[in-house]
């Protein structure tokens, strides 16, 4: 078996290749906006009162209290960005999230695409769906707008690239956010360009993580450079091999204990991702380390306790993992002690950064 270093150096070579190499065979990129009849477990029953008592951090939002256990067909608007190599789906009505992305050469979903909108009471305001890439801006995740409509705009750029911009206002912090989802006409990768602005005269809470999902399979190996991982409270632990000689970078060796949060640190690198060794496909993320240093892996526990959430969040697409990229090294969590505390967003400050998401194949 290849060493952990050998594995991620090979992934780095692929990232570098994607970053400098362009392909063009004259085929046009295609942008489609369509309404689909989509299998949906809906949500509703809004509390008529804002969140005065149960969670003051999300005031003035209210909470949704009703979640369907019967599936219906409901209209869902999708924005499809497609070139010769990949297809990216965006759903403005569900937090503006990237719903999924597929490598057209082999059908690999390098961003997990859920074939059902199964809303469950997980986010700060309640409704949340698994899969895709969730854009979190504000006080803490999963932010209040992750299950409700955002503004959006689509464009075909003069150079032939495709653009879908999503965004909105986080009412608790009064900050404004935008994400440009760009599919170049001649690359097997897409880009997200984020802009976040604090228009107020006071400090606001600062929390940003881009939460992507991938399929959870026994042959999945994570390429996450580092030699330690941080807990939510800031405690450093060994990575990837723990004191019991379990290689935590192998999904199947996480078959112990509760669900896992690994904030991996200790290497100055711009990329991370994962690879499925049996079918030689995978997924990757690139972002400048000085812009987005956080790299987190979230795994539901591999026992039936995690399987319950698979049943709650999808019908046929199986369990997923999350690979998250963040502006900070570790996610603040209420109740944890220092050194991890809530970061602040200075008055009238604007932050911008760029990330690239791409499929991987045949590098095993």
Give the ranges of each region predicted by the language model.
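Bacterial Sec-dependent N-terminal signal peptides
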Residues: 1-28
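Short N-terminal segments immediately surrounding and downstream of signal-peptide cleavage
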Residues: 27-43
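Short, hydrophobic/aromatic-enriched beta-strand segments in well-ordered soluble domains
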Residues: 168, 194-196, 349-362
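Active-site-surrounding "flap" and adjacent substrate/cofactor-binding loops of secreted or lumenal enzymes
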Residues: 105-124
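Core domains of carbohydrate- and sulfate-ester-processing enzymes
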Residues: 124-135, 139, 231-243
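Short, surface-exposed, low-complexity cationic segments
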Residues: 93-107, 170-172, 360-363
